[in-house]
Amino acid sequence: MHLLQEPVNKLKFFHALVAGGVAGMVVDIALFPIDTVKTRLQSELGFWRAGGFRGIYKGLAPAAAGSAPTAALFFCTYECGKQFLSSVTQTKDSPYVHMAAASAAEVLACLIRVPVEIAKQRSQTLQGNKQSGLQILLRAYRTEGLKRGLYRGFGSTIMREIPFSLIQFPLWEYFKLQWTPLTGFDSTPFSVALCGAVAGGISAGLTTPLDVVKTRIMLAERESLNRRRSARRILHGIYLERGFSGLFAGFVPRVLWITLGGAFFFGFYDLTTRILGATSTDH
């Protein structure tokens, strides 16, 4: 049985790799302007000083370069983790399996995501001036080192991503399971996209304060207090400075971006998986 199962696992791994990469790149490029607006709203500089509506595509290059490998690594880990945990626990479609697999996937994906976010967000808020994404990363490494430069905000990014995934993926899997019983229609890439949009929008709204903290830490200048403050102290400082609205800065573009992104991402992921599955069956 193990020998028969092995090629299927490898095939699923390959499908997740390709489908995740395609879906991630499509989303990041198509919805990049919304992400820029969100980042500038959350910046310590304020929206207009961070660039306003100028240069709305600044930072696209590092985002495009990093989106495919980040998404591919995430979905490979998620699908393989889900398959492994389901076999170990002898359960199928358990929300706890989805939560554990998504959490592990987020930690690994952040190894690529965090340096990409550093380059992208500093470009978006015009901190990189006319430097390329690679130049921004090299400068961060030379002046601040690996941990405080290239991987600044690693902890706060995980602190944002894991709660986000703990909400999003069980919801997405649950909505997919309920689609046919509730509607009477078979699952399609469109239905998967719709489920992803709703799950993503809910998750994005609830985790906005964590996203604000992550943005503040990544954009902090060398002399900024945010470089040395804990996430809790940064949240408290934002609340004292701007009140409740400060904690949810960028709420509308974040929810819009991830709702649309969820539709694109999960829809393209499902479509690509189906195409690859049909191709491998033909051969």
Curated annotation (Swiss-Prot):
Membrane topology: Multi-pass membrane protein
GO molecular function per UniProt: S-adenosyl-L-methionine transmembrane transporter activity
Bilayer-spanning residue ranges: 14-34, 55-75, 99-119, 152-172, 190-210, 248-268
Gene disruption phenotype: RNAi-mediated knockdown results in extended lifespan.
Location in or out of the cell: Mitochondrion inner membrane
Keywords: Membrane, Mitochondrion, Mitochondrion inner membrane, Repeat, S-adenosyl-L-methionine, Transmembrane, Transmembrane helix, Transport
GO cellular component: mitochondrial inner membrane
Solcar repeats: 11-84, 93-178, 187-275
Keyword Mitochondrion annotated: yes
GO BP terms, alphabetized: S-adenosyl-L-methionine transport
PROSITE patterns to which the protein is assigned, alphabetical: SOLCAR (PS50920)
Functional description taken from the UniProt entry: Mitochondrial solute carriers shuttle metabolites, nucleotides, and cofactors through the mitochondrial inner membrane. May mediate the transport of S-adenosylmethionine (SAM) into the mitochondria.
Family listed: Belongs to the mitochondrial carrier (TC 2.A.29) family.
Protein name: S-adenosylmethionine mitochondrial carrier protein homolog
Organism: Drosophila melanogaster
Taxonomic lineage: Eukaryota, Metazoa, Ecdysozoa, Arthropoda, Hexapoda
